């Protein structure tokens, strides 16, 4: 509402979510016309994350907000960049790869062999971000 009051159009906005924020970003970006979407260390669903941490616990029954991003990403029509570190100790790397696989085109990825959950904003990552943003113009 605030953006509409300021007359800022969706197509001029890039949605960026990191970790838990990727669930929110995926939710917001569905069926919208944003300039782009960037997901850093995304998860497939909170159920999947819970199962990796507590495999014998009935996670599905305990979660109110399941953030099933793997089911919602197909509804994102904007260009998307997925970034994930292979040594992420919080959100398993396979989840980022799966989210990339499920995403619609145009889609881009930056997978780092050395980054953990909080990715290092080094020159290589910044160049990938610039490349993605430049592709939106």
What are these regions (language model features)?
Residues 120-134:
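Post-His helix in hydrolase/transferase enzymes
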Residues 75-77, 82-88:
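Short beta-strand/loop motif that positions the catalytic acidic residue
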Residues 86-91, 116-119:
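Acidic catalytic loop of the alpha/beta-hydrolase fold
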Residues 10, 34, 77-78, 105:
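Active-site acidic short loop of glycosyltransferases
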Residues 2-54:
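Primarily recognizes the serine-hydrolase "nucleophile elbow" in alpha/beta-hydrolase
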Residues 35, 42-78:
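Mobile cap/lid helix-loop segments that gate and shape the active-site cleft of serine hydrolases
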Residues 69, 78, 92-101:
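Short alpha-helix in the alpha/beta-hydrolase fold that links the catalytic acid
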Residues 97-118:
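Catalytic histidine neighborhood in serine/cysteine hydrolases
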């Amino acid at each position: 509402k605030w953006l509409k009051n300021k007359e800022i159009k969706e197509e001029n906005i890039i949605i960026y979510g990191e970790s838990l924020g990727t669930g929110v970003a995926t939710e917001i970006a569905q069926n919208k016309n944003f300039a782009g979407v960037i997901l850093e260390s995304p998860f497939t669903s909170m159920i999947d994350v819970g199962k990796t941490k507590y495999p014998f616990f009935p996670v599905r029954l305990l979660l109110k907000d399941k953030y099933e991003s793997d089911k919602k990403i197909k509804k994102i029509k904007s260009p998307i960049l997925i970034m994930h570190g292979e040594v992420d100790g919080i959100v398993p790397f396979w989840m980022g790869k799966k989210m990339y696989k499920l995403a619609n085109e145009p889609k881009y990825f930056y997978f780092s062999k050395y980054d953990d959950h909080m990715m290092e904003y080094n020159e290589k990552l910044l160049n990938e971000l610039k490349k993605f943003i430049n592709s939106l113009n």
